[in-house]
From Swiss-Prot:
InterPro entries: 4_helix_cytokine-like_core, Somatotropin, Somatotropin/Prolactin, Somatotropin_CS. It comes from Giraffa camelopardalis. One of its GO terms (molecular function) is growth factor activity. Pfam families: Hormone_1. Keywords: Disulfide bond, Hormone, Metal-binding, Phosphoprotein, Secreted, Signal, Zinc. This is Somatotropin.
Length: 217
């Protein structure tokens, strides 16, 4: 469960998170680039927190503590997004251009749209995962934000984005099966890792462009 501090911050940002990108970009065409980056970072941070909380609760509920380390070192925990030539941390991300980081972020986001569309069905009977029903919509919203940033940086004429031919498998709804539990555990682990990458890339770009004093992360 999230601590009071992060929960309060998320509540304060609720109005901003609920505002669609189409409204922000269309109704407020004079929005600055810094504003677009700030909104994208906020959305990525929120999604990463949801992914991390869901993973931790799933792990606590279904995976015995003595098995967690060994599972994380098996093929179950392999994320196919690791085959994308993506930076693995802040230092590597700083070597990439903003457009490169945006394109990689878009690939990561799009690889999850299919699986997460049905996430709520997997955890429909569990109060622990009450936020899962809106994860897909939030992910689509972040995708729109990244596309908006790409349009701004490419002078309104973005090149055709690369689409991953392979995406993650769907979550398994048979929660009584050990194989299904391991599969879902691995997927949630990968989702958390990919959202962490996306948040890191967006924060690097925002800090690099606008030189904020609070760029340490």
């Amino acid at each position: 469960m999230m601590a009071a501090g992060p929960r309060t911050s998320l509540l304060l940002a609720f109005a901003l998170l609920c505002l669609p990108w189409t409204q922000m970009v269309g109704a407020f065409p004079a929005m600055s680039l810094s504003g677009l980056f700030a909104n994208a970072v906020l959305r990525a941070q929120h999604l990463h927190q949801l992914a991390a909380d869901t993973f931790k609760e799933f792990e606590r509920t279904y995976i015995p503590e003595g098995q967690r380390y060994s599972i994380q070192n098996t093929q179950v925990a392999f994320c196919f997004s690791e085959t994308i030539p993506a930076p693995t941390g802040k230092n590597e991300a700083q070597q990439k251009s903003d457009l490169e980081l945006l394109r990689i972020s878009l690939l990561l986001i799009q690889s999850w749209l299919g699986p997460l569309q049905f996430l709520s069905r997997v955890f429909s009977n569990s109060l622990v995962f009450g936020t899962s029903d809106r994860v897909y919509e939030k992910l689509k919203d972040l995708e729109e934000g990244i596309l908006a940033l790409m349009r701004e940086l490419e002078d309104g004429t973005p090149r055709a984005g690369q689409i991953l031919k392979q995406t993650y498998d769907k979550f398994d709804t048979n929660m009584r099966s050990d194989d299904a539990l391991l599969k879902n555990y691995g997927l949630l682990s990968c989702f958390r890792k990919d959202l962490h990458k996306t948040e890191t890339y967006l924060r690097v770009m925002k800090c690099r462009r606008f030189g904020e004093a609070s760029c340490a992360f």
